[in-house]
């Protein structure tokens, strides 16, 4: 995957550059070949109009240069594109530290290139096609890229919150600014422009492009809301400016197409409203396709690129709506639903569009620089320069007037508007590429220098002046207004981060100094080269700020009485600022956690969107956090689905057969059996289906007969057709009688069989109604046939009505479909519940992740306690709600948990593939095939069912970690477990009580609380930095085990467990657990498994507190600990050496001592790396337990008590002979031992056969050249987990039977008892 990532990163700029090059080459070729391409709305009417004025001459030139010599000029265009990109890269690199935007440098370079091209024919050949390129094509190539990239990178939540402000500025503000600019141009300039021409100029001048200002605001950490308003206004007013420009351009250059004022207003509304609708439709289609593609970067990037250009072209050319506004909506919708993009692809997608936007800006400003020097400066006089300066001042004043005009409204909606923000918005209204492109359009269409060249000159001048003056001074203005000041909490956070970086550097330096290869390095130079300074340290010298306010550490004062240093409490304002900063950082950390869960496949797309939305809404409100009440709405089912489900269930709700008593008389009993028989129901349904045909034919025949009788002339001979129709009508009437008899028989059978219960069913009521209708229909038909009633229009309508009502019997067929409809509705409800459960689970994990780092967010203890309380309270509330949800809908919880388990396994599988490929054990092709297999399964997981039936309670025992895989042990526990019931509020266990057994929750929800940080269950709510006497709470649900630690240590309960609902549990007494521990001693023994489960549970929070594991998820930490094992301390005489092969050493139980310093270490504790040897004191009440994790690179044998006797003897034998035997013979001996062990395990041989088959220790020692050991007597030692050479053992029970022991020589010459093969003594706890 890493190699694939590198390839994609290399591919992004190459594809982007190639795309731009192809577009520009095709554009220059087409513009040169066909003059001007009519692509805007204003040019749709008449292509001939575009060839007026100087258009014909350019057409001729373009024809000569385009068609006849296209292939000769194409490489020159590519040279220009490549050279422009090179100049852009050099300018961006060289002028990065200067306050001048690099686009200004490119514009100047383009102008210089244009001047050189005017005097040097060789250079002019490479710029000719660019200088004469159609400006419409320029817009269509670059504008979609610039618009989509800006919208796609915007904060959607902030934009939507400020949308009303943006619309006012982009619509009404643009119109006012355009009118004022037009009035200024008409009265200031001596160009004799009319109002239409001046409005066209005003629209161009009002199109803003504040890219440089927005980037600067982000770099300075200024208000995100302000930057979003400025950028959002630019996006929308570009589209509105183009629409206004097209309206007045049509009035200027195409007067024959001039419309009335009302038509122009309608046209503006049509374009401005229909454009976003078109963009919304395309965005939904794009999101749909993206959501069905999994981890394919090329396809997803291509879809967004194609959607962008198709949206702009189709909307702008075919639909005649605003393509700009359509692309804006497209970018915003795709951005808002970016969860439809694969997490692995999202980064590359952003980089791709950033690269395209960079190339587009680079080429636009280079091209405009060339065009301006060759076209705009031709007819410029001194007065034009004066006009330019006045115009620059005027448009700045006009923008300030517009913002001031609408400020009463802007300050009361959205995020509001302060006077400081208004000043920045006024000064930050830069002009850019859109205005230049529109000016080129005017220059291309105008036939006189008064319009075309002046438009281009003034537009280019305003662009340069705003970029050079406004963009370079905006930072100074921010500093003057105090908007660039870094708050005290931010400085404190930065200082804390730098301090932690220094601590990490010091640890790394100390570690490297002990490296034998780096021992002679110059550490002074290394330390100086790695020095990281605080970026905000220079700001602390601000003369306006008090010295104590800028102190990054804790401020203290001297007590006048005792002269002691007393910490100062922050002022209310400081406390509020620190609390607000901590709140925002906490919400940001929660959002990061949500995104991480989504990237790992642990959170659904819609769940991520909801959680991020809740976090962003909370961030907008002061002192607000994510509310549990808002989260509860995700899994609360409301609306039409519950109502529809109830109605459908009411339609099919009938009394059960057992609930309807059988009649006592014989005929009634027979009818009862008939009406409840499946064949009876099927027969009636078949009759209903067959009855549909005559009902339809009756309508057809009746209409046919009516038409024939109407067409027949009086006294004329009628053909034989009516007689045939009459026969058909008679047959249909007879069939109606037959079906009526069938339905009547059905009603009689049900009435006789059900009695008074017949009328209870809604369907029986419906059948009775239809039966009455059919009877009335027959009576009316017979009456008409006999002529008792005069046939007229009214009678015919009555007959048709009754026949139509008779056809309603077909609705009864839907009775069979109602269960299917209920399943569909249940599926929708389950999807909503699954989404809600996913939201709650994601929130819980987010709070747990934040809890690990919250101590490093805040230095103030009061704020820290408050944030912890808020986080833990919200987590517990959601845990409780999800427990109640699981009780009501267990299948939902099972489905979500199953999906998470599957994705975790697949993630680990993919990481393993990457590790194997990185180590060279897999080729790229092999790794790709394996990874493709994993990703196919990941994609299938996206369509997993939202509900899975929960397993039976017996299966919960199989899922207990220390029971999994051992069927004999499971049967043993199942036989001795008792199922207990507890009501709401009952106490299952109480803190301080003696441990009497284990509890496995089968159903319901319990609350657990206690003062110990390591509560006795599977999910200890450990919070980093918790106080010693703090009370911990948590909720447990199905599958959790309570009481393992108490059974092992025989200590009193350390927590109280109460029922939050009615609860069912499996209870295994402590006596039965002791019997099981004594009985099941084969590898791996039950006691070892129990201790290992407890060890991993205790070690997980200890490991996650360490700095090196801060970026790890809980699953990854547990996976890391799975490589660990419990050390058999009895074998090593309660001493343990810590060498370089050990990565983590955790004291789980008891007390240890540092052998060198005699420092006491109490459990639970992660042993420091500075400790190299531990000693332990064995006591009968508290036996020490040590859990170690070896390095991943360690490949040696692990004698940890997990191996059975055969494995240990084999490993010890191999270890002893490894230095005295060649590889061949050592391998032969190891193979022989392996075969013997396999045969012993399969046959279950006795101990005597074991001595005959397994090589004797003395034989091994003789083969290795070691003298046999002499047996000696020694005092018994504490018992170990499993028997092995050199261990002290006593009389044991194997599978419930006592085994006599015989002395065995130990390696140290000590005598120890021997047990039967595979037996393990229990550990005294």
Curated annotation (Swiss-Prot):
Q: Among its keywords, does the record have Ion transport? A: yes
Gene Ontology biological process terms in this record: potassium ion transmembrane transport; regulation of intracellular pH; single fertilization; sodium ion import across plasma membrane
**Renumbered residue ranges of the record's region cNMP-binding domain:** 968-1068
User: What InterPro entries does the record tag this protein with?
Assistant: Cation/H_exchanger_CPA1, Cation/H_exchanger_TM, cNMP-bd_dom, cNMP-bd_dom_sf, RmlC-like_jellyroll, Volt_channel_dom_sf
Please list the residue ranges that the record places on the Extracellular side of the membrane.
30-76, 120-135, 189-194, 250-260, 320-322, 378-382, 447-450, 709-724, 785-795
- Activity across pH: Optimum pH is 6.5.
Organism in which the protein naturally occurs? Strongylocentrotus purpuratus
Q: Which parts of the sequence are annotated with region: S4 segment of voltage sensor domain?
A: 796-857
Lineage of origin: Eukaryota, Metazoa, Echinodermata, Eleutherozoa, Echinozoa
| Residue span of region Interacts with the S4 segment of voltage sensor domain | 575-620, 860-919
Q: Where is the signal peptide?
A: 1-29
Which positions are annotated as binding 3',5'-cyclic AMP?
A: 1043, 1045-1046, 1053-1054
Q: Which reaction does it catalyse?
A: Na(+)(in) + H(+)(out) = Na(+)(out) + H(+)(in)
Q: Could you name the domain of life of the organism this protein comes from?
A: Eukaryota
Q: Which protein, by its recorded name, is this?
A: Sperm-specific sodium:proton exchanger
């Amino acid at each position: 995957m890493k190699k694939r990532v590198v390839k994609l990163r290399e591919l992004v700029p190459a594809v982007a550059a190639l795309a731009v090059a192809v577009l520009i080459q095709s554009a220059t070729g087409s513009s040169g070949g066909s003059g001007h391409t009519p692509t805007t709305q204003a040019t749709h009417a008449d292509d001939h109009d575009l060839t007026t004025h100087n258009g014909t001459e350019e057409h001729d030139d373009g024809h000569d240069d385009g068609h006849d010599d296209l292939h000769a000029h194409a490489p020159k265009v590519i040279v220009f594109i490549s050279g422009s990109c090179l100049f852009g890269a050099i300018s961006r690199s060289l002028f990065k530290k200067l306050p001048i935007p690099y686009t200004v440098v490119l514009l100047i370079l383009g102008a210089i290139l244009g001047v050189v091209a005017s005097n040097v024919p060789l250079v002019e050949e490479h710029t000719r096609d660019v200088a004469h390129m159609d400006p419409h094509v320029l817009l269509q190539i670059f504008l979609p890229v610039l618009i989509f990239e800006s919208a796609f990178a915007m904060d959607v939540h902030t934009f939507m919150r400020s949308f009303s402000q943006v619309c006012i500025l982009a619509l009404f503000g643009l119109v006012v600014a355009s009118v004022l600019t037009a009035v200024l141009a008409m009265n200031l300039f001596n160009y004799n422009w009319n109002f239409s021409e001046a409005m066209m100029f005003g629209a161009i001048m009002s199109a803003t492009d504040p890219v440089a200002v927005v980037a600067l605001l982000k770099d300075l950490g200024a208000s995100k809301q302000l930057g979003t308003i400025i950028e959002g206004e630019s996006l929308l007013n570009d589209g509105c400016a183009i629409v206004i420009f097209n309206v007045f351009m049509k009035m200027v250059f195409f007067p024959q197409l001039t419309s009335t004022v009302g038509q122009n207003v309608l046209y503006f509304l049509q374009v401005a409203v229909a454009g976003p609708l078109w963009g919304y439709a395309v965005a939904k289609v794009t999101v749909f396709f993206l959501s069905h593609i999994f981890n394919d970067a090329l396809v997803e990037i291509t879809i967004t690129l194609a959607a962008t250009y198709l949206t702009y072209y189709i909307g702008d050319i075919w639909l005649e709506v605003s393509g700009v506004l359509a692309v804006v909506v497209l970018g915003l919708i795709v951005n808002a639903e970016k969860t439809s993009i694969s997490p692995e692809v999202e980064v590359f997608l952003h980089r791709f569009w950033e690269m395209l936007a960079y190339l587009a800006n680079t080429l636009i400003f280079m091209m405009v620089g060339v065009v301006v020097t060759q076209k705009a400066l031709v007819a410029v006089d001194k007065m034009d320069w004066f006009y330019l300066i006045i115009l620059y001042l005027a448009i700045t004043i006009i923008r300030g007037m517009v913002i001031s005009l609408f400020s009463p409204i802007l300050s009361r909606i959205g995020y509001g508007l302060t006077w400081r923000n208004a000043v920045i918005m006024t000064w930050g209204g830069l002009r850019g590429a859109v205005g230049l492109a529109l000016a080129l359009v005017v220059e291309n269409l105008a036939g006189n220098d008064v319009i075309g060249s002046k438009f281009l000159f003034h537009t280019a001048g305003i662009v340069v002046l705003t970029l050079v003056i406004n963009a370079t001074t905006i930072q100074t203005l921010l500093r003057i207004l105090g908007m660039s000041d870094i708050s005290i909490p931010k400085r404190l956070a930065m200082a804390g981060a730098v301090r932690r970086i220094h601590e990490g550097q010091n640890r790394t330096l100390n570690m490297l100094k002990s490296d034998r290869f780096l021992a002679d390095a110059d550490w002074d130079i290394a330390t100086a080269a790695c020095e990281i300074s605080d970026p905000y340290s220079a700001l602390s010298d601000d003369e306006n700020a008090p010295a104590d306010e800028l102190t990054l550490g804790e401020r203290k004062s001297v007590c006048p009485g005792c002269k002691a240093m007393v910490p100062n409490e922050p002022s209310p304002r400081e406390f509020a600022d620190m609390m607000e900063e901590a709140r925002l950082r906490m919400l940001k950390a929660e959002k990061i956690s949500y995104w991480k869960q989504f990237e790992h496949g642990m959170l659904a797309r819609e769940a991520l969107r909801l959680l991020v939305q809740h976090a962003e809404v909370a961030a907008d409100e002061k002192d607000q956090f994510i509310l549990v009440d808002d989260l509860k709405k995700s899994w609360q089912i409301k609306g039409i689905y519950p109502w529809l489900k109830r109605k459908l269930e009411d339609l099919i709700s009938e009394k059960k057969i057992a609930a309807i008593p059988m009649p006592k008389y014989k005929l009634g009993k027979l009818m009862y059996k008939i009406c409840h028989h499946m064949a009876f129901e099927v027969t009636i349904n078949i009759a209903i289906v067959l009855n549909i045909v005559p009902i339809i034919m009756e309508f057809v025949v009746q209409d046919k007969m009516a038409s024939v009788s109407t067409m027949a002339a009086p006294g004329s001979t009628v053909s034989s057709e009516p007689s045939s129709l009459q026969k058909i009508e008679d047959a249909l009437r007879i069939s109606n009688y037959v079906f009526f008899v069938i339905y009547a028989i059905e009603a009689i059978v049900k009435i006789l069989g059900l009695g008074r219960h017949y009328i209870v069913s809604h369907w029986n009521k419906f059948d009775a109604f239809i039966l009455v209708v059919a009877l009335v229909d027959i009576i009316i038909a017979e009456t008409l046939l006999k002529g008792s009633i005069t046939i007229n229009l009214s009678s015919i309508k009555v007959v048709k009505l009754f026949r139509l009502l008779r056809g309603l019997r077909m609705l009864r067929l839907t009775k069979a479909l109602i269960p299917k409809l209920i399943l569909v509705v249940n599926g929708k409800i389950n999807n909503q519940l699954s989404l809600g459960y996913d939201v709650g689970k994601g929130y819980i994990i987010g709070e747990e992740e934040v809890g690990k780092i919250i101590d490093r967010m805040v230095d103030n203890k009061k704020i820290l306690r408050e944030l912890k309380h808020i986080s833990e309270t919200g987590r517990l509330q959601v845990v409780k709600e999800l427990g109640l949800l699981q009780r009501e809908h267990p299948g939902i919880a099972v489905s979500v948990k199953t999906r998470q388990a599957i994705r975790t396994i697949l993630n680990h599988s993919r990481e393993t593939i990457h590790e194997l490929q990185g180590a060279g054990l897999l080729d790229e092709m092999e790794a790709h095939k394996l990874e493709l297999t994993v990703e196919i399964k990941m994609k299938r997981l996206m369509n997993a069912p939202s509900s899975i039936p929960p397993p039976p309670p017996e299966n919960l025992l199989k899922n207990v970690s220390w029971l999994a895989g051992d069927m004999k042990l499971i049967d043993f526990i199942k036989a001795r477990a008792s199922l207990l019931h507890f009501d709401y509020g009952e106490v299952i266990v109480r803190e301080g009580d003696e441990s009497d057994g284990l509890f496995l929750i089968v159903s319901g929800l319990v609350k657990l609380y206690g003062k110990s940080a390591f509560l006795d269950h599977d999910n200890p709510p450990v919070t980093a930095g918790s106080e010693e006497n703090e009370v911990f709470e948590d909720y447990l649900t199905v599958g959790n085990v309570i009481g393992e630690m108490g059974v092992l240590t025989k200590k009193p309960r350390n927590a109280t467990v109460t029922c939050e609902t009615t609860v069912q549990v499996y209870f295994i007494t402590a006596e039965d657990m002791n019997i099981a521990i004594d009985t099941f001693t084969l590898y791996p023994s039950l006691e070892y498994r129990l201790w290992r489960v407890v060890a991993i549970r205790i070690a997980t929070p200890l490991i996650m507190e360490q700095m090196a594991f801060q970026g790890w998820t809980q699953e990854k930490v547990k996976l890391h600990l799975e490589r660990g094992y419990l050390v058999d301390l009895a074998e090593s005489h309660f001493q343990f050496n810590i060498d370089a092969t050990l990565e983590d050493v955790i004291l789980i139980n008891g007390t240890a001592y540092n052998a060198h310093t005699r420092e006491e270490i109490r459990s639970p504790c992660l042993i420091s790396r500075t400790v190299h040897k531990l000693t332990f004191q064995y006591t009968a009440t508290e036996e020490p337990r040590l859990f170690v994790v070896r390095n991943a690179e360690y490949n040696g044998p692990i004698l940890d008590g997990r191996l059975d006797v055969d494995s240990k003897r084999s490993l010890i034998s191999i270890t002893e002979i490894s230095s005295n035997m060649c590889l061949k013979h050592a391998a032969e001996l190891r193979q022989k031992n392996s075969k013997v062990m396999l045969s012993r395990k399969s046959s279950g041989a006795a101990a005597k056969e074991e001595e005959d088959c397994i090589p004797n220790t003395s034989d091994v020692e003789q083969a290795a050249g070691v003298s046999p050991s002499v047996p000696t007597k020694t005092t018994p030692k504490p018992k170990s987990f499993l028997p092995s050479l050199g261990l002290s053992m006593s009389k044991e029970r194997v599978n419930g039977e006592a085994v006599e022991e015989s002395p065995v020589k130990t390696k140290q010459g000590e005598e120890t008892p021997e047990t039967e093969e595979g037996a393990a003594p229990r550990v005294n706890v």
